[in-house]
Amino acid sequence: CSQSRGLGDVYKRQTIDKIVDAIFQIQGGYSLVMLTQNSLVGVRDPFGIRPLVIGKLKNSYVMTSETCALDIIGAKFIREVENGEIVLIENDELKSIKPFPQKKVRPCVFEYIYFARPDSILDGKTAYEHRKNLGVELAKENDVNADIVVPVPDSGNAAALGFAQHLGMNFELGLVRNHYVGRTFIEPSQKIRSCLLYTSDAADERN
Protein backbone atom coordinates (compact mmCIF):
# COMPACT_ATOMS: atom_id res chain seq x y z
CA CYS A 1 0.00 0.00 0.00
CA SER A 2 2.79 2.44 0.90
CA GLN A 3 4.62 1.53 -2.31
CA SER A 4 1.57 2.26 -4.50
CA ARG A 5 1.03 5.54 -2.64
CA GLY A 6 4.65 6.46 -3.27
CA LEU A 7 4.32 5.72 -6.99
CA GLY A 8 1.16 7.84 -7.07
CA ASP A 9 3.01 10.78 -5.53
CA VAL A 10 5.77 10.45 -8.12
CA TYR A 11 3.21 10.36 -10.95
CA LYS A 12 1.47 13.43 -9.52
CA ARG A 13 4.74 15.38 -9.31
CA GLN A 14 5.66 14.38 -12.85
CA THR A 15 2.28 15.53 -14.17
CA ILE A 16 2.52 18.93 -12.47
CA ASP A 17 6.17 19.34 -13.49
CA LYS A 18 5.25 18.73 -17.13
CA ILE A 19 2.42 21.25 -16.95
CA VAL A 20 4.72 23.85 -15.35
CA ASP A 21 7.39 23.23 -18.01
CA ALA A 22 4.79 23.68 -20.77
CA ILE A 23 3.15 26.86 -19.49
CA PHE A 24 6.50 28.53 -18.83
CA GLN A 25 6.94 28.46 -22.62
CA ILE A 26 3.60 30.19 -23.28
CA GLN A 27 3.16 33.94 -23.48
CA GLY A 28 -0.28 35.53 -23.52
CA GLY A 29 -3.66 34.94 -21.96
CA TYR A 30 -5.16 31.54 -21.28
CA SER A 31 -7.22 29.50 -18.88
CA LEU A 32 -6.84 25.73 -19.11
CA VAL A 33 -8.76 22.80 -17.69
CA MET A 34 -7.27 19.31 -18.00
CA LEU A 35 -8.36 15.84 -16.98
CA THR A 36 -5.85 13.16 -16.10
CA GLN A 37 -6.69 9.62 -15.09
CA ASN A 38 -7.02 10.59 -11.43
CA SER A 39 -7.24 14.37 -11.25
CA LEU A 40 -8.72 17.63 -12.51
CA VAL A 41 -6.23 20.42 -13.21
CA GLY A 42 -6.93 24.10 -13.83
CA VAL A 43 -4.38 26.73 -14.90
CA ARG A 44 -4.71 30.50 -15.24
CA ASP A 45 -2.11 32.70 -16.93
CA PRO A 46 0.23 34.84 -14.77
CA PHE A 47 -1.63 38.10 -15.53
CA GLY A 48 -5.12 36.66 -15.08
CA ILE A 49 -6.08 37.78 -18.58
CA ARG A 50 -8.63 35.01 -19.00
CA PRO A 51 -11.05 34.00 -16.22
CA LEU A 52 -11.32 30.60 -14.54
CA VAL A 53 -13.53 29.70 -11.60
CA ILE A 54 -14.00 26.76 -9.25
CA GLY A 55 -17.38 25.42 -8.21
CA LYS A 56 -18.71 22.45 -6.32
CA LEU A 57 -21.55 20.14 -7.31
CA LYS A 58 -22.54 17.90 -4.40
CA ASN A 59 -19.20 16.32 -3.40
CA SER A 60 -17.33 17.00 -6.65
CA TYR A 61 -15.39 20.01 -7.91
CA VAL A 62 -16.00 21.62 -11.30
CA MET A 63 -14.13 24.31 -13.25
CA THR A 64 -15.34 26.69 -15.91
CA SER A 65 -14.50 30.05 -17.46
CA GLU A 66 -17.76 31.70 -16.31
CA THR A 67 -19.90 31.47 -13.19
CA CYS A 68 -23.08 31.31 -15.30
CA ALA A 69 -22.12 27.74 -16.25
CA LEU A 70 -22.12 26.85 -12.54
CA ASP A 71 -25.64 28.27 -12.19
CA ILE A 72 -26.89 26.20 -15.12
CA ILE A 73 -25.84 22.87 -13.57
CA GLY A 74 -26.71 23.91 -10.01
CA ALA A 75 -23.13 24.06 -8.75
CA LYS A 76 -22.00 26.36 -5.94
CA PHE A 77 -19.38 29.01 -6.71
CA ILE A 78 -16.27 28.50 -4.56
CA ARG A 79 -13.71 31.02 -5.84
CA GLU A 80 -11.77 32.29 -8.83
CA VAL A 81 -8.53 30.61 -9.79
CA GLU A 82 -5.89 33.25 -9.07
CA ASN A 83 -3.57 34.65 -11.70
CA GLY A 84 -0.59 32.35 -12.23
CA GLU A 85 -2.18 29.58 -10.17
CA ILE A 86 -2.35 25.86 -10.90
CA VAL A 87 -5.19 24.09 -9.11
CA LEU A 88 -4.89 20.33 -8.69
CA ILE A 89 -8.00 18.45 -7.56
CA GLU A 90 -7.58 14.81 -6.64
CA ASN A 91 -9.63 12.57 -4.35
CA ASP A 92 -11.92 15.56 -3.64
CA GLU A 93 -8.95 17.52 -2.27
CA LEU A 94 -7.89 20.87 -3.73
CA LYS A 95 -4.23 21.83 -3.88
CA SER A 96 -2.94 25.24 -5.00
CA ILE A 97 0.42 25.57 -6.77
CA LYS A 98 1.91 28.95 -7.73
CA PRO A 99 5.04 28.45 -9.86
CA PHE A 100 5.17 31.97 -11.33
CA PRO A 101 6.61 35.14 -9.78
CA GLN A 102 3.77 37.32 -8.48
CA LYS A 103 2.45 39.74 -11.13
CA LYS A 104 -0.21 42.44 -11.16
CA VAL A 105 -3.58 41.19 -12.39
CA ARG A 106 -4.41 42.52 -15.86
CA PRO A 107 -7.74 41.00 -16.95
CA CYS A 108 -8.94 41.36 -20.54
CA VAL A 109 -11.35 44.29 -20.77
CA PHE A 110 -13.35 42.42 -23.41
CA GLU A 111 -14.51 39.98 -20.73
CA TYR A 112 -16.19 42.89 -18.95
CA ILE A 113 -17.72 44.63 -21.95
CA TYR A 114 -18.39 41.81 -24.40
CA PHE A 115 -17.37 38.19 -23.85
CA ALA A 116 -18.90 37.37 -20.46
CA ARG A 117 -22.58 36.61 -20.15
CA PRO A 118 -24.38 39.43 -18.27
CA ASP A 119 -25.08 37.26 -15.22
CA SER A 120 -21.50 35.98 -14.87
CA ILE A 121 -19.56 37.34 -11.90
CA LEU A 122 -16.23 39.11 -12.50
CA ASP A 123 -14.35 40.49 -9.51
CA GLY A 124 -17.38 40.31 -7.25
CA LYS A 125 -19.87 41.97 -9.63
CA THR A 126 -21.92 40.70 -12.54
CA ALA A 127 -20.84 41.63 -16.05
CA TYR A 128 -24.17 43.48 -16.29
CA GLU A 129 -23.23 45.70 -13.33
CA HIS A 130 -19.78 46.41 -14.77
CA ARG A 131 -21.28 47.40 -18.13
CA LYS A 132 -23.95 49.57 -16.58
CA ASN A 133 -21.34 51.34 -14.45
CA LEU A 134 -19.28 52.01 -17.58
CA GLY A 135 -22.32 53.73 -19.07
CA VAL A 136 -22.68 55.87 -15.96
CA GLU A 137 -19.00 56.89 -16.12
CA LEU A 138 -19.36 57.74 -19.80
CA ALA A 139 -22.37 59.93 -19.00
CA LYS A 140 -20.35 61.80 -16.37
CA GLU A 141 -17.72 62.64 -18.99
CA ASN A 142 -20.15 63.54 -21.79
CA ASP A 143 -23.09 65.80 -20.97
CA VAL A 144 -24.93 65.43 -24.27
CA ASN A 145 -28.24 66.91 -25.40
CA ALA A 146 -30.30 64.12 -26.96
CA ASP A 147 -33.85 62.82 -27.04
CA ILE A 148 -33.21 59.12 -26.53
CA VAL A 149 -30.41 56.65 -25.91
CA VAL A 150 -30.33 53.62 -28.23
CA PRO A 151 -27.98 50.72 -27.47
CA VAL A 152 -26.21 48.49 -29.98
CA PRO A 153 -27.47 45.09 -28.80
CA ASP A 154 -26.80 43.00 -26.97
CA SER A 155 -23.60 43.86 -25.11
CA GLY A 156 -24.30 47.59 -25.27
CA ASN A 157 -27.70 47.36 -23.58
CA ALA A 158 -26.50 47.66 -19.98
CA ALA A 159 -24.03 50.47 -20.70
CA ALA A 160 -26.65 52.44 -22.62
CA LEU A 161 -29.15 51.97 -19.79
CA GLY A 162 -26.65 53.30 -17.24
CA PHE A 163 -25.88 56.23 -19.54
CA ALA A 164 -29.58 57.05 -20.00
CA GLN A 165 -30.49 56.73 -16.34
CA HIS A 166 -27.64 58.97 -15.19
CA LEU A 167 -28.63 61.75 -17.60
CA GLY A 168 -32.37 61.26 -17.17
CA MET A 169 -32.94 60.36 -20.82
CA ASN A 170 -35.36 57.92 -22.39
CA PHE A 171 -33.97 54.49 -23.22
CA GLU A 172 -35.27 52.83 -26.39
CA LEU A 173 -34.42 49.61 -28.21
CA GLY A 174 -34.09 51.11 -31.67
CA LEU A 175 -31.99 48.28 -33.10
CA VAL A 176 -33.04 44.65 -33.36
CA ARG A 177 -30.28 42.06 -33.25
CA ASN A 178 -30.31 38.91 -35.36
CA HIS A 179 -29.31 36.25 -32.83
CA TYR A 180 -28.53 33.75 -35.57
CA VAL A 181 -25.49 35.75 -36.69
CA GLY A 182 -22.29 35.08 -34.77
CA ARG A 183 -19.65 37.54 -33.60
CA THR A 184 -18.72 39.64 -36.60
CA PHE A 185 -15.42 41.12 -35.39
CA ILE A 186 -13.62 37.76 -35.27
CA GLU A 187 -14.25 36.91 -38.93
CA PRO A 188 -11.00 36.65 -40.98
CA SER A 189 -11.70 39.28 -43.65
CA GLN A 190 -13.24 42.74 -43.82
CA LYS A 191 -15.52 41.59 -46.65
CA ILE A 192 -17.09 38.91 -44.45
CA ARG A 193 -17.32 41.31 -41.49
CA SER A 194 -19.07 43.94 -43.62
CA CYS A 195 -21.50 41.38 -45.04
CA LEU A 196 -22.42 40.03 -41.63
CA LEU A 197 -22.80 43.55 -40.26
CA TYR A 198 -25.79 44.13 -42.53
CA THR A 199 -27.46 40.94 -41.27
CA SER A 200 -26.50 41.40 -37.61
CA ASP A 201 -28.56 44.45 -36.61
CA ALA A 202 -31.59 46.15 -38.12
CA ALA A 203 -33.26 49.45 -37.26
CA ASP A 204 -36.73 49.21 -35.77
CA GLU A 205 -38.48 51.85 -37.90
CA ARG A 206 -41.65 51.67 -35.82
CA ASN A 207 -39.98 53.40 -32.84
Question: What do the PLM-derived regions correspond to, one by one?
Answer:
Residues 69, 166, 205:
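Active-site catalytic microenvironments for nucleophilic, acid-base chemistry
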Residues 55, 131, 135, 162, ...:
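Glycine-centered structural positions embedded in regular secondary structure
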Residues 1-11, 198-207:
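Single conserved hydrophobic/aromatic residue that forms the stacking wall/gate
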Residues 169-200:
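Short, glycine/charge-rich flexible loops or terminal/linker lids adjacent to PRPP-binding catalytic cores
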Residues 85, 160-172:
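Structured, non-catalytic alpha/beta "coupling" segments that mediate domain-domain communication
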